[in-house]
Amino acid sequence: MYGGDFDGNAAFAGGGFMPSQATTQAHESSSSLKNRDVRTLLPLTLKQLSSASTTGESNFSIDGVDIKTVVIVGRISRMENRITQVDFVVDDGTGWVDCVRWCHARQETEEMEAVKLGMYVRLHGHLKIFQGKRSVNVFSVRPVTDFNEIVHHFTECMYVHMYNTKLRGGSITQDTATPRPQMPYSTMPTPAKPYQTGPSNQFPNQFNDSMHGVKQTVLNYLNQPMHIVSEAGVHCDIIARELRIPLLQVKEALEQLSNDGCIYSTLDETCFKSTANA
């Protein structure tokens, strides 16, 4: 996939994950839908990005949701290194967009050194428009190492679009909305809150009736910030020792969490990392 054009059929041939169906309790009226905080983080295809409506140089909206920060997955088709910035073009098969990554700090420079022409990347950035031309001011970018992530991104884009368009056309209000239990780490929409990504990617069965005891304890442990940022993950022996849970139970919990799409193995089948922010 690195050497040629984006192949949509090939990308969707793999397996992906849908966001969790968990929702949180409604506290707002649906009339506030169009007044979302501009910091809302939305996964978008470049076709969606190009069709987003705008009322100025920094006010964008799509499906009735205000946006400024976007998540994009695509292939770098052009790249130019400058003294204090890197200009590049990302193509995801639905369109392309100019991107710029400013490199003032060492960490920013090292981040861009890991990105090469032809690579598929996942980036976060602010959507801008200047003289009628849209671009993304990137503040985070990394190579895609698991191509299931491409499938997941497109699936999430479709899910978010369908949810927000159905919500916008519905007539659910605060009086008619049915309260639902709050779930840890949930980023799913309420009847008055559009879908937006949060600190983790949520997948099916992550929080259901069977997610109790050891599984939840292990997941919470792997979702700690110190483990989220670790590329190597955590060894099952360390998890068992830290949590004081029998190793056999920890291994069973890890296997179930892996099947649920909540975690994945890293160095080998004994080290695991949460899919949060993967």
UniProtKB/Swiss-Prot annotation:
Query: Which terms does the record give in the GO molecular function aspect?
Result: DNA binding
Cite the PANTHER family for this sequence: REPLICATION PROTEIN A-RELATED, REPLICATION PROTEIN A2
Give Gene Ontology CC terms. nucleus
What's the family? Belongs to the replication factor A protein 2 family.
Q: What is known about its processing and modification? A: Phosphorylated in a cell-cycle-dependent manner (from the S phase until mitosis). In response to DNA damage, recruited to DNA-repair nuclear foci, as a hypophosphorylated form.
A GO BP entry is: DNA recombination
What's the chief localization of this chain? nucleus
Task: Quote the function comment for this protein.
Answer: Component of the replication protein A complex (RPA) required for DNA recombination, repair and replication. The activity of RPA is mediated by single-stranded DNA binding and protein interactions. Required fo cell division in meristems. Involved in the maintenance of transcriptional epigenetic gene silencing (TGS) at specific loci (including some transposons) by regulating histone H3 acetylation, 'Lys-4' and 'Lys-9' methylation.
Pfam families recorded: RPA_C (PF08784), tRNA_anti-codon (PF01336)
Subunit composition and interactions: Heterotrimer of RPA1, RPA2 and RPA3 (canonical replication protein A complex).
Q: What residues are annotated to bind DNA? A: 70-143
Q: Which gene encodes it?
A: RPA2B
| Entry keyword annotation includes DNA-binding | yes
What are the subcellular locations of this protein? Nucleus
Per the record, the coiled-coil ranges are: none
Q: What is this protein called?
A: Replication protein A 32 kDa subunit B
